């Protein structure tokens, strides 16, 4: 991170800090927000604190459309909540690494500390001598600042090394879908097929439109097996080629 882009501002209260945070945010709305586990930790915490201390109307200012909505998702049998901020996309860099960082192989942990060391040879700053972040803040404020800066620097260096955020955007633009839909496959295929049909002057049925409740699809054709050896038989596993296919 360019030192000229680092600014330290001291506040007398959390209320002042959050007000200034909102002012900086709305002065130049981001199109994409990213970070490690940012969706279910940072966004959830920041928006919830703004609502609690400043009110929901102030929290709505985070959205260029002045609309936020809480959503919950079950992850590994545990319900996790976050906030959806209309008008911008939250691309969690941890999810991007899990989805597209396959060249680095399966990881024993997906904590930023481990991934940073696995990919870059760099870890988060250690503050174990202080017990917790509150003690670190009170006893060594400079290390506290450096600790937070290091997290941001690791994300930036991971992107320089892997270009995962760039890949997410490339898949989204190529598939004609939102950035979040680049993590799936159905939306990309639907968009690709839809645009091909339109180019061939064929109007496909609209999801939820007339005829949407015609019942379940019959499904694909499955040929009865013919036992024995057969020449010129080849099987292609296309699943492993996503999103390159």
Predicted regions and their residues:
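Active-site-proximal helix-loop-helix substrate-binding element of RNase H-like nuclease domains
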Residues: 3-8, 12, 43, 52, ...
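Phosphodiester-processing cores and adjacent nucleic acid-binding clamps
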Residues: 32-33, 59, 92-94, 228-229, ...
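Common nucleic-acid-contacting/processivity interface regions adjacent to the catalytic cores
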Residues: 131-245
């Amino acid at each position: 991170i360019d030192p000229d882009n680092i600014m330290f501002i001291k506040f007398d209260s959390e209320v002042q800090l959050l007000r200034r945070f909102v002012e900086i945010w709305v002065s130049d709305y981001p199109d994409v927000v990213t970070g490690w586990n940012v969706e279910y930790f940072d966004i959830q915490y920041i928006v919830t604190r703004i609502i609690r201390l400043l009110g929901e109307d102030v929290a709505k200012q985070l959205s260029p459309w002045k609309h936020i909505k809480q959503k919950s998702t079950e992850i590994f049998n545990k319900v996790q909540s976050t906030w959806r901020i209309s008008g911008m996309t939250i691309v969690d860099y941890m999810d991007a690494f899990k989805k597209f960082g396959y060249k680095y192989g399966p990881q024993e942990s997906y904590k930023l500390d481990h991934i940073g060391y696995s990919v870059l040879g760099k870890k988060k700053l250690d503050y174990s001598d202080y017990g917790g972040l509150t003690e670190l803040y009170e006893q060594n404020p400079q290390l506290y600042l450096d600790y937070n800066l290091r997290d941001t620097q690791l994300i930036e260096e991971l992107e320089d090394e892997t270009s995962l955020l760039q890949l997410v955007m490339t898949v989204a633009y190529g598939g004609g879908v939102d950035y979040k839909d680049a993590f799936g496959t159905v939306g990309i295929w639907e968009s690709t097929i839809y645009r091909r049909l339109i180019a061939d002057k064929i109007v496909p049925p609209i999801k939820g439109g007339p005829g949407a409740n015609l019942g379940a699809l019959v499904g694909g054709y499955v040929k009865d097996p013919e036992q024995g050896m057969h020449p010129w038989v080849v099987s292609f596993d296309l699943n492993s080629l996503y999103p390159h296919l």
